[in-house]
């Protein structure tokens, strides 16, 4: 046990990003309520980052925006997509964190030098294999590895892997592949009836899955940052 009362450590979490395309409070509230109703177990009280890049030209009351989103059933972690200094001041005044998205560009010489000193951080681990049914309320995570389930996955269960996910049975729960952001990850399933499928943060709720593939043996992947699905057999 540590001798210090608290420890502050870095970690990684997968968060959903709520992209706002309309600044109307009434529209936002109704849209969030409708979305949560589609998958309440997954989305109710879920932490989200609000991206305001699409409505950057509008005047936003961030205190009111936070209240609207949280009253609708989500929990606001921070704001992203803001590039205007005055708007950022308004976000800070609303006591909301500003989260920056994107990559840091390094000078070529520094980048080349970094490559010579690269050390793998996330070493792929041995595949995690589950032989028993996954029941409602269960949550299985395979960090830095693939996840294989050799049985059925009930509604309300959740499978998460940093790599690929294979389900050799009926999938009625939720599955998230590429949880750490690996866009090359796939989902393979012999009978798709999922509440939610997600790869590297891109997801479909049950009503967004093309009906032609429901109940079928399928694989899902990302193409140009969009989910795609095709039959396995």
Swiss-Prot record:
Listed InterPro entries: CAP/MinC_C, MinC, MinC_C_sf, MinC_N, Septum_form_inhib_MinC_C
Source taxon at top rank: Bacteria
Gene Ontology terms describing biological process: cell morphogenesis; division septum assembly; regulation of cell division; regulation of cell septum assembly
Keywords on record: Cell cycle, Cell division, Septation
Role according to the record: Cell division inhibitor that blocks the formation of polar Z ring septums. Rapidly oscillates between the poles of the cell to destabilize FtsZ filaments that have formed before they mature into polar Z rings. Prevents FtsZ polymerization.
Family: Belongs to the MinC family.
NCBIfam families according to UniProt: minC
Subunit structure: Interacts with MinD and FtsZ.
Protein name per its UniProtKB record: Probable septum site-determining protein MinC
């Amino acid at each position: 046990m540590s001798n210090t009362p608290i420890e502050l450590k870095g970690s990684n979490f997968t968060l959903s990003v709520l992209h706002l395309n309309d600044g109307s409070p009434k529209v936002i509230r109704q849209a969030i309520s409708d979305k949560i109703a589609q998958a309440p177990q997954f989305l109710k009280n879920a932490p989200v980052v609000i991206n305001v890049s699409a409505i950057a030209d509008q005047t936003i009351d961030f205190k009111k925006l936070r209240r609207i989103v949280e009253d609708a059933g989500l929990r606001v972690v921070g704001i992203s997509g803001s590039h205007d200094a005055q708007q950022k001041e308004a976000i800070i005044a609303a006591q909301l964190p500003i989260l920056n998205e994107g990559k840091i560009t390094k000078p070529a010489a520094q980048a080349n030098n970094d490559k010579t000193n690269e050390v793998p951080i996330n070493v792929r681990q041995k595949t995690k294999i589950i032989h028993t049914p996954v029941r409602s309320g269960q949550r299985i995570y395979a960090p830095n590895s693939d996840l294989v389930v050799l049985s059925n996955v009930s509604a309300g269960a959740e499978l998460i892997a940093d790599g690929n996910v294979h389900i050799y049975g009926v999938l009625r729960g939720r599955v998230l592949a590429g949880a750490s952001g690996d866009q090359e990850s796939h989902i393979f399933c012999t009978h798709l009836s999922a509440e939610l499928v997600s790869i590297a943060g891109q997801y479909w709720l049950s009503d967004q899955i093309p009906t032609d593939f429901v109940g079928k043996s399928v694989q899902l992947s990302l193409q140009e940052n969009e989910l795609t699905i095709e039959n396995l057999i």
